[in-house]
Amino acid sequence: MHSSGSREAATVFLPYLRVFTTAEASQILEFAVALPLLAVFIVGTFDFSQAFNLKQKLNNAAREGARFASNLPTNDLSNATSCGSPPSPASVCAVRDLVSAYLQRARINDCGLSTKGASATTPWTYVASGNGCPAGGELTLTVDRSYAFPATVPGASGPLYVVSSRVTLSYPYQWHFGNVIQFLVPGASYAAVTQISTDAVVPNMD
C-alpha cells in the first residue's frame, strides 16, 4: 500500500517538478529577480515625472502672480487694513487670490490659500496647510512688491537697481519611491516629503 501511494504521488507531482527543470523555470526565476527592479523603475519614473509636472505648474503660477503684481499700483502698500487677518494691502491679496485660482485650475490643492491672511511684516507671506494639503505639509506664498535686483547698464558707474515684484511659491510633494526601494536596498531611507520651490520676478510698471 505504501509503495502504491508513493507511486501515485509521484505521478501527480512529476509534471510540476519537470517545470522547474525547463527553460520556462529559468524565465520564472529571472522574472522573480527582476520584478523588484522593475517596480522601482516604474514607481521612480512616475514619482519624478509627477514632481517635474508639479514644478512646471508652480513655475507658471508664480510667473502669473509676479506679472499681475507688477501691473498693480503701489500706492496701497502702506495701507495694510484692506483684507485678511492679519490685514494686508488689497493689491497683495489680489495676487494671493490669483495664485490660488491658478493652482485650482491646474488641479493642484491650494491648501486653503484663498482664505489665509499674510504675515504682519513685509514681504507678505502666506502659509496654508488646510483643505487636505498633501502629506500634511504647508504651502508658502511670499509676495514682495519692492524687490530690487541689480541691472548692468553700459556707461553707468555702477549697477542700477530695478524695483520689481517677486512671487515665491513653495509646495509639499510626497514621494512614493522610498516605499519600493526597500526591495533592492533594505534599510534605505529617503525623505517622504520635500518642498518644491520656485520664484518669478517682473519689473514694476507703476
Which role fits each region the language model picked out?
Residues 27-73:
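Aliphatic-rich helix starts adjacent to a transmembrane/signal segment
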Residues 2-9, 60-206:
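Short, conserved structural patches
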Residues 1-24:
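N-terminal leader/signal peptides at the extreme start of proteins
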Residues 23-26, 39, 93, 194:
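Alpha-helical membrane and juxtamembrane elements of multi-pass inner-membrane transport
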